[in-house]
A protein has these predicted regions:
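Catalytic or ion-translocation cores adjacent to nucleophile or general acid/base/metal-coordination motifs
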Residues: 101
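Short gly/pro/ser/thr-enriched loop/turn and capping motifs at secondary-structure boundaries
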Residues: 105-110
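Short substrate-entry loop that stabilizes the transition state in hydrolases
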Residues: 83
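Short glycine-/small-residue-rich Rossmann-like dinucleotide-binding loops
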Residues: 78-80, 104
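Short, hinge-like loop/turn segments at secondary-structure boundaries
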Residues: 116-120
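Iron-sulfur (Fe-S) cluster-binding modules
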Residues: 1-75, 86, 90-98, 121-282
């Protein structure tokens, strides 16, 4: 827990940002926090962040990629998809006092976790002209499957206000105030009419973690789960509602296999649907 690792550091704590298999969107969210970061520069020092530093030669680039450490707080983006990733995250954990995973890839495997439901060699053969040059693991897994994680920040991409809250909370030695309720709460707070009740639009809001501000429902589009499962989601009821809204079994499976495909809750939807189809009617 971050509260147990809160800074008892007399000098400025050091921050490191790491990339694994991802699109860099969550790192860009940190760079987008321009004014907020300026306000924190006297309290924390960014020591390792490839996205915001100039390129170097091969030797310097390798050293910067691996990082020297130790670091007080590491933010890790991306999932583990190669043997090299699996080895490097162990190194990152060893040189990090606190480790926070940021984004759907790091917390739930990302879209690349679609390989978990198929044969990765089939994907490689379909995409690459020379598949023999590609070395990838059979699955894409979150960081927590490989090393202990002190806090997870969800989203695709993460919310900038939540990111600043995590950094500020670490500096203050307290638990980050990140809500664990569903997107439905955010719709009510901003006065958005429920699009499922009013229009029959399929929406994952009831089982999706809050954090986006309910942007999609505000524009008449159903939530598609980019922040991953909420706390204790009722997936059985959600699947039943999606059926009533006219979604096919294949589309129900697809809607849960997007940004957070490897989350245990969303990954179980296929088994849940099969179980219900085999059950005799009440």
């Amino acid at each position: 827990m971050l509260t147990e690792l809160g800074p008892v550091i007399r000098t400025r704590p050091t921050l490191a940002v790491w990339k694994f298999a991802s699109c860099d969107g969550c790192q860009l969210t940190l760079l987008d926090c321009e004014n907020e970061l300026l306000g924190l520069t006297d309290r924390i020092r960014v020591d390792h962040f490839l996205e915001m530093t100039p390129a170097e030669g091969a030797e310097g680039g390798r050293a910067r990629l691996e990082g020297r450490g130790p670091y007080d707080l590491s933010l890790v983006e991306g999932s583990i998809t190669t043997a090299g990733d699996a080895e490097r995250i162990q190194h990152v954990r060893r040189i990090s006092r606190a480790l926070v995973t940021i984004g759907a890839c790091a917390t739930a495997g990302g879209v690349q976790a679609l390989r978990n439901f198929a044969d990765v060699d089939d994907f490689i053969a379909a995409v690459y002209a020379r598949p023999e040059y590609i070395a990838a693991l059979e699955t894409s897994t979150p960081i927590s499957a490989h090393v202990p994680v002190d806090f997870e920040l969800r989203g695709c991409p993460i919310d900038r206000r939540q990111l600043i809250e995590v950094i500020t909370a670490y500096l203050a030695g307290r638990t980050p105030q990140i809500p664990d309720h569903s997107v439905c709460f955010e719709c009510k707070r901003r006065g958005t009419t429920c699009i499922t009740v009013a229009h029959g639009t399929p929406c994952l809001g009831p089982v999706t973690h809050a954090g986006c501000g309910a942007i999609c429902p505000a524009y008449g589009r159903g939530c598609y789960g980019c922040f991953g499962p909420s706390s204790r989601p009722n997936l059985r009821s959600m699947v039943a509602q999606l059926r009533r809204d006219g979604m096919s079994e294949r589309d129900i499976q697809r809607v849960f296999r997007t940004f957070n495909a490897a989350s245990p809750e969303y990954a179980s939807v296929s088994d849940l649907a099969a179980e219900e189809q085999q059950s005799p009617p009440a």
